[in-house]
A protein has these predicted regions:
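Dual-mode signal for accessory low-complexity, basic/Gly-rich regions
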Residues: 1-167
Length: 167
């Protein structure tokens, strides 16, 4: 579901991380685990209820994931912009336009237009659209510019292509 160099994993027991917790909201012990390994789905995110419904074991994710991370390259956001050359840097998404059954999405966005690897102009009131599976498969690289303050700790992501509408 992802390129081979991408792995997505959870580290819920990191010291001093804001999302760390020894137990999930169901009282189940949390543990480090891989959800995607070398681009292949290796585990679902399951709380006690969903695990019971699927006749599987809980993964200790009642209340969500904790310190979710993705493998990354060595480039920061500036390096990824240079690698991209010309395209759109999305800095803000608006709305809830994702179909969880088909993976299709259409969301309002804002950001910056990039020319020659440099930010050229601000862009707002645009729409980005596509399919999550196709987008995940077209990831070129994940950046090393990770902000550790949140629950999901992933750097900038360079995607090969995306549909854009607006001026």
């Amino acid at each position: 579901i992802f390129p081979q160099e991408i792995s997505i994993y959870e580290e819920p027991l990191l010291k001093r991380a804001s999302a760390s917790a020894p137990f999930d909201s169901d009282g189940v012990a949390t543990r480090a685990q891989n959800f995607v390994t070398d681009g292949v789905l290796s585990s679902y995110v399951l709380d006690s209820y969903s695990a019971r419904r699927l006749e599987m074991q809980t993964t200790g994710n009642g209340g969500g994931v904790r310190n979710l991370r993705m493998t990354h390259g060595t480039l920061d956001q500036e390096g990824l912009l240079k690698k991209m050359g010309t395209g759109l840097l999305v800095t803000e998404l608006m709305g809830q336009g994702v179909n969880t059954i088909t993976g299709d999405y259409s969301r309002g966005a804002a950001g910056f237009w990039v020319e020659g690897g440099e930010i050229a102009s601000p862009v707002d009131e645009i729409t980005i659209a596509g399919n999550l599976k196709e987008m995940f498969g077209s990831i070129v690289e994940s950046g090393a510019d990770i902000d550790p303050r949140g629950n999901i700790q992933v750097g900038s992501i360079l995607i090969e292509q995306m549909s854009i509408a607006g001026e």
